[in-house]
């Protein structure tokens, strides 16, 4: 379904004047003979920019299949036919509907669905790349964690398609020799906000390890400090506990907001480069920040 939303573009033909010029040069003529012809699929639609279309295509494909099954619009085979073969014939009807429908829109009518959706979501993408939006996202993540719900899995799953679009633009800018300008991407939160995991609990693990007065606190600190270095802090969140604990929830929510503001100002002042790639989230903070910002040592500091 997704590939059918992409309008193929034709490869420009070599003009007669270029052909005449190339005939006088054997190497140039050989090069022109090797050039492809026909149509190609634009590669930019296969990247992060096409993620929204991919999500919509999945919904459309599933709904068409469900509709044909509920309404009985399918090829029914005799009972003697093996179930696997019968299911293959049943899926032919929705497949034909999808191919004809999407081909009519893209191939025959020439409607660029990617361009339309890109225009519609552009205000949302621009709004996400702001400090207030980033603070709201962080607050929502911490809010869900406060009740023991994995905030990153819920909020980040919704914001990730937009983050990837912004990150892709940063990567393209650096590849073209320009400066990346989008600050509000996922690696920004990962390496400058969630230090030691959601809520920046690495400092809390160190505090428990060396300053806790109770035996339980010291044991918890020694147990969680190593995982926290690699951004795994569920033992601290549920062991302290931070969940449903007002005394720890306040810094758990406020500290990431403060860190985000400081890091945003530093990046906006070009003290640190914008993130241009995704580094594995289990890396220690300085290493991950260094890699995500394209080898900028200031990010590690």
Map each language-model feature to its residues.
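Juxtamembrane inter-helical linkers in multi-pass membrane proteins
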Residues: 72-88, 123-124, 164-182, 216-237, ...
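Hydrophobic alpha-helical transmembrane segments
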Residues: 35-47, 52, 93-96, 135-147, 190, 193-201, 245-260, ...
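Transmembrane alpha-helical segments and their short flanking loops
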Residues: 11-34, 168-180, 205, 223, ...
């Amino acid at each position: 379904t997704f590939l059918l939303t992409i309008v193929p573009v034709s490869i420009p033909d070599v003009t007669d004047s270029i052909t005449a010029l190339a005939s006088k040069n054997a190497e140039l003529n050989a090069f022109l003979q090797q050039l492809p012809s026909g149509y190609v699929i634009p590669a930019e639609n296969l990247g992060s920019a096409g993620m929204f279309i991919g999500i919509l295509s999945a919904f459309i494909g599933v709904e068409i299949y469900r509709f044909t099954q509920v309404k009985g619009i399918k090829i029914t085979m005799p009972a003697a036919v093996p179930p696997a073969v019968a299911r293959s014939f049943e899926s032919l009807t929705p497949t034909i509907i999808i191919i004809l429908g999407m081909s009519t829109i893209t191939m025959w009518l020439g409607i660029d669905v990617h361009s339309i959706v890109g225009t519609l979501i552009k205000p949302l993408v621009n709004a996400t790349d702001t400090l207030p939006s980033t603070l709201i996202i962080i607050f929502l993540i911490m809010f869900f964690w406060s009740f023991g719900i994995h905030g990153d899995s819920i909020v980040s799953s919704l914001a990730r398609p937009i983050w990837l679009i912004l990150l892709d633009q940063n990567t393209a800018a650096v590849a073209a020799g320009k400066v990346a300008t989008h600050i509000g991407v996922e690696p920004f939160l990962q390496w400058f906000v969630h230090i030691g995991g959601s809520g920046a609990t690495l400092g809390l693990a160190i505090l428990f390890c060396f300053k806790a007065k109770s035996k339980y606190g010291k044991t918890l600190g020694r147990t969680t400090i190593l995982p926290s270095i690699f951004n795994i802090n569920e033992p601290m969140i549920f062991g302290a506990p931070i969940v449903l604990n007002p005394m720890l929830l306040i810094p758990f929510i406020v500290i990431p907001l403060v860190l985000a503001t400081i890091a945003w100002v530093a990046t906006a002042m070009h003290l640190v480069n914008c993130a241009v790639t995704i580094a594995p989230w289990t890396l220690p903070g300085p290493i991950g920040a260094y890699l995500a910002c394209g080898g900028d040592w200031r990010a590690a500091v």
